[in-house]
Amino acid sequence: MAEVEKLKQLQLQREALKKRGEQKVKETEKKRTEESVQSVCPECGSRQLVHDYERAELVCQNCGLVLDEEFIDRGPEWRAFDHDQRMKRSRVGAPMTFTIHDKGLSTMIDWRNRDSYGRAISSKNRAQLYRLRKWQRRIRVSNATERNLAFALSELDRMASALGLPRNVRETAAVVYRDAVDKNLIRGRSIEGVAAAALYAACRQCSVPRTLDEIAEVSRVSRKEIGRTYRFISRELGLKLLPTSPIDYVPRFCSGLNLKGEVQSRAVEILRQAGERELTSGRGPTGVAAAAIYISSILGGERRTQREVAEVAGVTEVTIRNRYKELAEKLDIEIIL
């Protein structure tokens, strides 16, 4: 019983630290927002601003204008030359993240049986430490909501890893799922379905598009359920998502076909011209992107067959034939097959 009381006290301390940490994060975010007001170059209007830490300057990457100088380096005062050295000298934990149910603000008892000085724990105290560690794992997920989040976020991470999605997409998906939980949109729906729909919405928000078929392949629910749940949560959460642009698919498809940068640039230009003439309206973005890449590969001397392009893009050869003929005719592109 004494051990349980200790663990309850630890949990109360953990919750107090968690609240203090969240308040600190809010203050830091507010400060960062105030500091980043000047996020547009006054000379050329570009948003591509880069911090040059060697010269302590904020430089526009487009025109080279120095917007700020002698800014404060908020990094650590120590230097490290490899990963092990960095881990030894670091005095803080990982940053806050929405992809963990407790946002990464909780603590845990280390699995190595050593004290704070690095000395081995005596055999007499190891049994007690084992019990404390077991109870610590149990109380870390204390209620049904946290259990729901823990399972859903692990499912999100699994699907994102299978699709090779970057960190910002995972964070956005976790935020969308948390909002759905807060508004009680999970009731009557499967956790996997809502998680997959949140991931699909995050991909669209971050301009890293994935099709419903691709999401369905790595999830445990059907494409139909993902689409239905996605429409529901986007309506209830008020997500304002623009239609997916075919241009967003070009880099991934070109990489899958091992095409050079010139072919990719030409495909993007073809799609821009098609967009200006409204040739992409009402058509699937993957099919239009695949057709533009097919045309570009022929013009660039790196011909890929319609079957190869169709396999990478996840569309049929008939779709590519119809779209590429339409693009070639409307844009006056002469193709020699």
Swiss-Prot record:
A zinc finger (TFIIB-type) spans 36-68. One of its GO terms (biological process) is transcription preinitiation complex assembly. Stabilizes TBP binding to an archaeal box-A promoter. Also responsible for recruiting RNA polymerase II to the pre-initiation complex (DNA-TBP-TFIIB). Sequence repeats lie at residues 154-237, 248-329. Zn(2+) binds at residues 41, 44, 60, 63. InterPro entries: Cyclin-like_dom, Cyclin-like_sf, TFIIB, TFIIB_arc, TFIIB_CS, TFIIB_cyclin, Znf_TFIIB. PANTHER family: TRANSCRIPTION INITIATION FACTOR IIB, TRANSCRIPTION INITIATION FACTOR IIB-RELATED. One of its GO terms (molecular function) is DNA-binding transcription factor activity. One of its GO terms (cellular component) is transcription preinitiation complex. This is Transcription initiation factor IIB. It holds the Pfam family TFIIB. The keyword Protease does not apply. It comes from Methanoculleus marisnigri (strain ATCC 35101 / DSM 1498 / JR1).
